[in-house]
Amino acid sequence: MEKDDAFLRKLNAGKKVIAIELDSPKDADLTNYLAGAKRLQAAGADLLTIADCPIARARMDSSLVACRVHRELGLCTLPHMTCRDRNLNATKALLLGLYAEGVREVLAITGDPIPTAERDEVKNVYQFNSRKLAQYIVSLAGEGREMPSPMTVFGALSLNARNFEVELRRAGEKLENGMSGFLTQPVLSEQAVENLRRTRETLGERAKILAGIMPVVSQRNAIFMENEVNGIHVAEDIMEAFAGLDREQGEALGLEISLKMAREALPYADGFYLMTPFNRVALMERLIARLKTELLQEQ
């Protein structure tokens, strides 16, 4: 049975969409998570994305959470699926389950490696990379195949890659292997905006691009992202601007910077991929409201 997907319908109609990431719990309780997802849905999010054990730390499974949210809230979901933790059999089994639950979009990524200190107990799998994973996912659909219609596969795009020419070439290869579009790393510098422009210029309209927007909430947060999180670059003037601010002031500044970055990214993007810092749902409700009133009011 074909699924009526409100997110894809809106995206393919040329309307700007809002996807928002909310990390799954570290324990077995989904109560607060579902409450947060419901608030983000009410605020106007078109899609909820769930990371797959980011920085290789175990959390509740992204695909299971996606199914629960989709089933209980009716909100479109995009579980991330890494190549790090599953072999081909486990990947196929999970994809078939997602399809049966009505979750028809996935984000295929290679995934952060297991920290060296933990590799005696936890093993990397990496049977394939994100391009091969995308190719495999789309190969499951068709006459006589396991899925009657294809899943939609998105990928990641690092606007902050040191060699952006290589990143652009890989993006083209990902499209050739079945991906439909990209969610980018956070736009937190003018160079990231320029690389987003180059991406649109190079890939044209064949790729759907959601520009990553993540509010910085403190100087410590900015420094950590700059130094410790792969693929993120925070401009120096942004880091300096948070010096001496308390929580309320930090959130207010982070909100304004996010809106500025979103405004600059808008001409080159099909929508936004919002990342929730420290599960601060109230902050993201404010960001969505202002995006809708200040940037997307004509939709």
State where each predicted segment sits:
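Active-site pocket-lining/capping segments in soluble small-molecule metabolic enzymes
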Residues: 3-8, 111, 124-146, 158-161, ...
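Hydrophobic faces of well-ordered beta-strands that scaffold small-molecule active sites
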Residues: 18-24, 48-50, 77-81, 106-108, ...
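Active-site-adjacent beta->alpha loops and helix N-cap segments on the catalytic face
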Residues: 2-10, 29-31, 56-68, 87-93, ...
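Structural motif
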Residues: 43, 72, 101, 177, ...
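Active-site cofactor/substrate anionic-group-binding motifs, chiefly glycine-
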Residues: 44-84
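Active-site mouth loops of central-metabolism enzymes
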Residues: 17-32, 77-89, 151-166, 242-256
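Active-site-proximal loop/turn and secondary-structure-junction residues that shape catalytic pockets
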Residues: 22-26, 52-56, 83-85, 110-114, ...
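Conserved N-terminal beta1-alpha1 strand-loop-helix module at the mouth
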Residues: 1-50
